[in-house]
C-alpha cells in the first residue's frame, strides 16, 4: 500500500501523523510511505530522520495525497478538499459532528474516512482519543492557571493560594480521561477541585483515585449552575463519541461568573459545552472575553506540545495503521470491531449515527455500507 503523511496546515498544529519509527514499521511491512517536506519539523523530526526510516520525501502536497491511505492528525481544511478522491482511506481526527462542510466533501468525493475519536473498545473507552485527551486535560489546568493571571485578562488568582489566602476554585465538568487529567494537574497546583459527572460509578472511581482530595458531584443543571458561578476556572471535558457535545453551561450561568474568571472548552472541536463558546480560537489568538469571562476555545490544544503529543499519538494509532495497511480496510474492519466503529463515511454514505443525526443525513451501518 502507498501511504501519505502530509504536513499539518491548521493554525499552530505542529504534530505529525507518524513519527519516523512509525514510518519504519510500515516500510518494514512492505509499504511505501511518502512524507511531505518538513511534515515533522514542528515535532523536531527532520526530513533526514524520515528518509533514514525508509520514507520518500516529497515537496508537492498533491503527490503526498495521491496515495491509497493518508494518515494525519487533524481534520483536513478546505484547501485540502480538492485532493479527496474516491476510495482514498483517510485516517485522522475528524470530529465531523461539528464539520458539515467537511462531511459533505467526504461524501461527495466518496472518501473512506476513519476517525480516531470514534474507534471504541468494548468497555466504551476510546484508545486513539485517550492519549490526546490526557494531554489536553493536563494542559487545560496549566492554561487556565496562566489566563487567570491579570496580565492575561484574568482576575489575578493563584490557583494554589498562599497561607492565609483561599485557593482558587476549579470546576471540571466531565470525569473521563480529559477531566481526570485536568484534575491531576489542578490538584498539583494546589487548587480546590470539583468534578461533576453523570455516572455515579465514575464518581466513586474518582473519589477512590484521588483519595477524597477532590469534590465529586452529580452533574445536573442545578449543580452545574451552583458550581460554575462560584468557580475561578471551569473546564469543559464532556465527550459523546462521534456526536456533538451537549451545551451544558448556559449563557445565564456564564453571566453569573465573576469578572476575570476563565473557562476552557476542551470539547470545542465537537461544538463545545458552553453556550458562549460560539467560535473556535487558535494558539495565535487563544482567548476572547464575553460577559467579563475569559473564554479559551482552541481546538488543537495538544498541538502546542507536539513532541509529546506526536509520540503518544503514534503509540496508539500505529497498530491500527498497520492493520489497515497489511489487511486492507475491509479485512481490517471484519477482524477488528473497534476499528470498524471508526468508519465515519464510506463511498458516499455516512456510517456514524452521531454525524448523521447532527446534519439530518441518511445513516448506514458499517455492515450495511460495506456489505460485510
From Swiss-Prot:
InterPro entries registered for this protein in UniProt: Ala_DH, Ala_DH/PNT_CS2, AlaDH/PNT_CS1, AlaDH/PNT_N, AlaDH/PNT_NAD(H)-bd, NAD(P)-bd_dom_sf
GO function terms (MF aspect): alanine dehydrogenase activity
GO biological process: L-alanine catabolic process
Entry annotation: catalytic residues: 95
PROSITE patterns: ALADH_PNT_1, ALADH_PNT_2
Pathway of action: Amino-acid degradation; L-alanine degradation via dehydrogenase pathway; NH(3) and pyruvate from L-alanine: step 1/1
Protein's UniProt keywords contain Electron transport: no
Pfam families, A to Z: AlaDh_PNT_C, AlaDh_PNT_N
Binding positions for NAD(+) per the UniProt entry: 169-199
EC number: 1.4.1.1
Catalytic reaction(s) noted: L-alanine + NAD(+) + H2O = pyruvate + NH4(+) + NADH + H(+)
Keywords of this entry: NAD, Oxidoreductase
Highest taxon, organism lineage: Bacteria
CC terms in the record's Gene Ontology section: plasma membrane
Functional note: May play a role in cell wall synthesis as L-alanine is an important constituent of the peptidoglycan layer.
Family: Belongs to the AlaDH/PNT family.
Protein name according to UniProt: Alanine dehydrogenase 2
Amino acid at each position: 500500500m502507498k501511504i501519505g503523511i502530509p504536513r499539518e496546515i491548521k493554525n499552530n498544529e505542529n504534530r505529525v501523523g507518524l513519527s519516523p519509527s512509525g514510518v519504519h514499521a510500515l516500510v518494514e511491512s512492505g509499504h511505501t510511505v511518502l512524507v511531505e517536506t518538513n511534515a515533522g519539523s514542528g515535532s523536531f523530526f527532520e526530513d533526514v530522520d524520515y528518509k533514514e526510516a525508509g520514507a520518500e520525501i516529497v515537496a508537492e502536497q498533491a503527490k503526498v495525497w495521491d496515495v491509497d491511505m493518508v494518515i494525519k492528525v487533524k481534520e483536513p481544511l478546505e484547501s485540502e478538499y480538492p485532493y479527496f478522491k474516491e476510495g482514498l482511506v483517510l485516517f485522522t481526527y475528524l470530529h465531523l459532528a461539528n464539520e458539515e462542510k467537511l462531511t459533505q466533501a467526504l461524501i461527495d468525493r466518496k472518501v473512506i474516512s476513519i476517525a480516531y475519536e470514534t474507534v471504541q473498545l468494548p468497555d466504551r473507552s476510546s484508545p486513539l482519543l485517550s492519549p490526546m485527551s490526557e494531554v489536553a486535560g493536563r494542559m487545560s489546568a496549566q492554561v487556565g492557571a496562566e489566563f487567570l493571571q491579570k496580565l492575561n485578562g484574568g482576575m489575578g488568582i493563584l490557583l494554589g493560594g498562599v497561607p492565609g489566602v483561599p485557593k482558587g476554585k476549579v470546576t471540571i465538568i466531565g470525569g473521563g480521561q480529559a477531566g481526570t487529567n485536568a484534575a491531576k494537574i489542578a490538584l498539583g497546583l494546589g487548587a480546590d477541585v470539583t468534578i461533576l459527572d453523570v455516572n455515579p460509578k465514575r464518581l466513586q472511581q474518582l473519589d477512590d483515585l484521588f483519595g477524597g482530595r477532590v469534590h465529586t458531584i452529580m452533574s445536573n443543571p442545578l449543580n452545574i449552575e451552583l458550581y460554575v458561578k462560584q468557580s475561578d476556572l471551569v473546564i469543559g471535558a464532556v465527550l459523546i463519541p462521534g456526536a456533538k457535545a451537549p451545551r451544558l453551561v448556559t449563557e445565564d450561568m456564564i453571566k453569573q461568573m465573576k469578572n476575570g474568571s476563565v473557562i476552557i472548552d476542551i470539547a470545542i472541536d465537537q461544538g463545545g459545552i458552553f453556550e458562549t463558546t460560539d467560535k473556535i480560537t487558535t494558539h495565535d489568538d487563544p482567548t476572547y472575553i464575553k460577559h467579563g469571562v475569559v473564554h479559551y476555545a482552541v481546538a488543537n490544544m495538544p498541538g502546542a506540545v507536539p513532541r509529546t503529543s506526536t509520540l503518544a499519538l503514534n503509540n496508539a494509532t500505529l497498530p491500527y495503521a498497520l492493520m489497515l495497511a497489511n489487511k486492507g480496510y475491509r479485512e481490517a474492519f471484519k477482524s477488528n470491531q473497534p476499528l470498524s466503529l471508526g468508519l465515519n463515511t464510506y463511498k458516499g454514505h455516512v456510517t456514524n449515527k452521531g454525524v448523521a443525526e447532527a446534519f439530518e443525513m441518511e445513516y448506514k451501518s458499517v455492515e450495511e455500507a460495506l456489505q460485510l
